[in-house]
UniProtKB/Swiss-Prot annotation:
It comes from the Eukaryota. Essential for the assembly of the photosystem I (PSI) complex. May act as a chaperone-like factor to guide the assembly of the PSI subunits. It comes from Chara vulgaris. This is Photosystem I assembly protein Ycf3. It is found in: Plastid, Chloroplast thylakoid membrane. Keywords: Chloroplast, Membrane, Photosynthesis, Plastid, Repeat, Thylakoid, TPR repeat. One of its GO terms (biological process) is photosynthesis. Belongs to the Ycf3 family. Pfam families: TPR_1. One of its GO terms (cellular component) is chloroplast thylakoid membrane.
Amino acid sequence: MPRSQKNDNFIDKTFTIIADILLRIVPTSQREREAFTYYRDGMSAQAEGEYAEALQNYYEAMRLEIDPYDRSYILYNIGLIHTSNGEHAKALEYYFQALERNPSLPQAFNNVAVICHYRGEQAIQQQDIESSKAWFNQAAEYWKQAIQLAPGNYIEAQNWLKITGRI
């Protein structure tokens, strides 16, 4: 039984029901339906902190999914898991793959910026001022792209850009 059919909370159950209805109404192939089921199960596992299970589901969804736009969200979520696990280099790989397929994904730009900013902070702690400036400048560029795509979001990033004179 797919994980999505075992959900106990109201929101997950509602989402599952609506998604199932849409999958019946909208013409989709069996492969697309399977890919979506794995994606949905991955999101459910991820929300519960079951990252290994989520990754298994996302990898299976990637194997089945052929649409670049849909694949971008799977890749983005894989990046989120690696970020949560502190695997920033791996997370960046997945965020960049997501952006290759969908350059209108502001949350991926934001997360890349957050990792760059974090690395800038680490460089400061190591007394490496030149590296910190480079990381912060990279963070600024990615935040600018995220803000351009979603102007009402990322207020803290907008403030940081203003305070640091990068906007």
